[in-house]
Curated annotation (Swiss-Prot):
GO terms for cellular component: cytoplasm; endoplasmic reticulum; TRAPPIII protein complex. It holds the Pfam family TRAPP. The gene is Trappc6a. This is Trafficking protein particle complex subunit 6A. It is found in: Golgi apparatus, cis-Golgi network; Endoplasmic reticulum. It comes from Mus musculus. The lineage of its organism: Eukaryota, Metazoa, Chordata, Craniata, Vertebrata.
Amino acid sequence: MADAVLFEFLHTEMVAELWAPDPDPGSGGKRRSLSVLEGLGFRVGQALGERLPLETPAFREELDALKFLCRDLWAAMFQKHMDGLRTNHQGTYVLQDNSFPLLVTMGSGPQYLEEAPKFLAFTCGLLCGALHTLGFQSLVTASVASLPACKFQVVIQKS
């Protein structure tokens, strides 16, 4: 439990630091901040993608890799399982978390929906990095319709 709280504090501070007012407003500030958060998440996802599946054989199917993310990776990061996994069987998957830990502490008013994406960028990178390590190129986007629920859309790139 203490690890979860420490991670939440670390994540909040990363977002706050990267979203602090930029003294050079012409440098692409917010877009660059999202890229930095995604990059950090990507690297963490790569490391977890190497370490967590040591007992399991290599994932040959996309669906098996996504199930691994929903169960094992999510439990390692957030001490819970993903609430839903849907697919169109054409390389697009939607992962749903009805109580995403990094959004639970936010208020539920509509004004907070604008702030939510910056709290999801790290996790998008995390999922993308883990999939990369497992051998799947992907594009991950997040959306929030009502707090604290969120959806991550994963599109597997066909080579």
